[in-house]
C-alpha cells in the first residue's frame, strides 16, 4: 500500500480561486479587504514569511498594510502601531510576526490585538469563543487541517482522531474544532506525558502529528489505512552539513497509511489560505 497524498497546495489554490470571487463581490460594494502585518526587526526568516503573506494577498485582491519597525523599537512604539491598526477601517485583520525581540512583551502585544481583527484566530478572547461555540476568527492551522480533510472527503463524523501535540497554536485548538457538532470526531489529545503513545495512535482512524519531533510517528505506530497529517516542521542538519526542514512523520509511514498530508506541501499552504479567509470573512461582516 502507498498512501494517497492529500495536496495542500492544490487545495489552497482552489480556496484562493473562491476568495477572488468573494473579494470581487466586496469590491462591488466598495469594500476592499485589508490584511496588516507587523514586523519588528530584520530577521530573514520572518521577512520571508511576511513577504509570502503579502504575495498571497496580491493573488486574491486583498490589500496589504505593512508595518515595519526596527529591532530596537520600544514597547510603546509597538503598542502605538497596534492601536493604529485597531482603529484603521482599511484593516480587517492583522498579524504580528513572531518571534519578537527579547525586550518586548510578546503576550502583551498579542493581547493588544483587537479580537475582531485577529487574523490568526489565536487571541485569548477568540480561543474562549471557540471553547464556548461562539462565532469568531478560527485558528488558521487547525482550520486549514479540517478544511483539507473535508475537501478530500475524509470522514470526520464519528472518527477516532489522535492529535499528538498540545501547543496553543495547533494541538489544543484543533481538538476543539474536531469536537464541534459540525465535525463530531472523538479526539484523544496526546503529549509528552502520554503513556504508550503507540497504543493511542494505533487505535485512531486519523493521526495528526504536531509535536515538533522529527520522525516521531513511525510505520508501526499506525493502523494500515489510517489517515496521517504531518504538521511538524523542524530544521535539521543533514549528513552533508546542509540544513533542511523535516516533519514529524517518518517517510516509511507512506507504505502503511491510506492517506497522508505531507510536509512540505500540506498544512502550510492551507494555513496561509485560512489567514486570507479570516480577513475576507471579517470584511464581509462589515
From Swiss-Prot:
Alphabetical list of Gene3D superfamilies matching this protein: Leucine Dehydrogenase, chain A, domain 1, NAD(P)-binding Rossmann-like Domain
Catalyzed reaction equations: (6R)-5,10-methylene-5,6,7,8-tetrahydrofolate + NADP(+) = (6R)-5,10-methenyltetrahydrofolate + NADPH; (6R)-5,10-methenyltetrahydrofolate + H2O = (6R)-10-formyltetrahydrofolate + H(+)
GO molecular function: methenyltetrahydrofolate cyclohydrolase activity; methylenetetrahydrofolate dehydrogenase (NADP+) activity
Pathway linked to the protein: One-carbon metabolism; tetrahydrofolate interconversion
Keyword field contains Oxidoreductase: yes
GO annotation, cellular component aspect: cytosol
E.C. code: 1.5.1.5, 3.5.4.9
Keyword line: Amino-acid biosynthesis, Histidine biosynthesis, Hydrolase, Methionine biosynthesis, Multifunctional enzyme, NADP, One-carbon metabolism, Oxidoreductase, Purine biosynthesis
Gene Ontology process terms (BP): L-histidine biosynthetic process; methionine biosynthetic process; purine nucleotide biosynthetic process; tetrahydrofolate interconversion
Family: Belongs to the tetrahydrofolate dehydrogenase/cyclohydrolase family.
PANTHER family hit by this protein: C-1-TETRAHYDROFOLATE SYNTHASE, CYTOPLASMIC, C-1-TETRAHYDROFOLATE SYNTHASE, CYTOPLASMIC-RELATED
UniProt function note: Catalyzes the oxidation of 5,10-methylenetetrahydrofolate to 5,10-methenyltetrahydrofolate and then the hydrolysis of 5,10-methenyltetrahydrofolate to 10-formyltetrahydrofolate.
Protein name per UniProt: Bifunctional protein FolD 2
Organism (species): Salinispora arenicola (strain CNS-205)
